[in-house]
Regions:
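Domain-level signal for soluble alpha/beta catalytic cores
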Residues: 1-231
Length: 231
């Protein structure tokens, strides 16, 4: 039994990590009649798994997702290549389709969140760029909470926030304005100013703050001490 006042949480990778990423879906035709059949089965596997976590007591499931950071970087790299840009857009569309199908019909008292991760190995990162190129896709995803990295300039401006929020009153955008990569602490007034700036674009009641990522996305962790983390 879960103690009163405790919300059991499970974090898992997003199904988008399997869709046209690092050749993980190259062999789909060996097992499925069509690409859509593959996506549907992937969505069902995730749906059933999340439901199982719920049945075991979880009431908060978060899907960690590096695909959107990857797409941000790729859209920028290929902006002068229409053919490649179209391929990237198709990946984004397939991601939205699969994720939403996986989330459909889950219990209403289950909170569904995602963290848009850009990499966090030894205080470095994999991807950079603003959310502008993927905002319209994020705005279609049926999550309750979006954790968005915003700890430095590599994440771009707050301009895409209204598109991501998409006038959904129940959706919360949690802004990762506190870095977990660097032991130096942020100026409190500067953080407050940033939240007020975001609140000019999205209602304050739909905003939250957090660290941009965890302290250790891998065994090695970031370049800071345990005491730095508690500070």
């Amino acid at each position: 039994m879960t103690p009163e006042g405790i919300t059991p949480k499970v974090t898992i990778p997003s199904p988008s990590l399997i869709i046209n990423r690092d050749h993980r879906s190259d062999l789909y035709a060996d097992y499925y009649d069509s690409w859509t059949d593959f996506l549907d089965d992937l969505a069902k596997a995730y749906h059933d798994t999340i439901q199982h976590f719920y049945d075991l007591g979880a009431r908060y499931v978060q899907l960690d997702d590096t695909t959107w950071g990857y797409l941000i970087q790729q859209f920028e790299n290929e902006k002068n290549n229409p053919e490649k840009t179209a391929e990237l857009a198709k990946i984004a569309e397939d991601d939205v389709y699969t994720i939403n199908k996986a989330l459909k019909g889950l219990p209403e008292d289950l909170t569904l969140a995602t963290h848009i991760c850009r990499g966090n190995f030894k205080s470095t990162y994999l991807f950079e760029g603003g959310y502008d190129s993927v905002a319209k896709y994020l705005g279609q995803l049926n999550y309750d909470i979006f954790f968005l990295e915003y700890d430095d300039a590599r994440s771009g401006s707050f301009a895409p926030l209204p598109t991501i929020w998409n006038n959904r009153d129940h959706v919360e955008l949690v802004l990762g304005v506190i870095t977990s990569k660097d032991p130096n602490l942020e100026n409190v007034d500067a953080v407050i100013d940033r939240i007020h700036a975001a609140a000019e674009l999205v209602p304050l009641k739909n905003l939250g703050i957090s660290t941009q990522c965890g302290f250790a996305s891998s065994e090695e962790g970031n370049l800071l001490t345990e005491q730095d983390e508690w500070n």
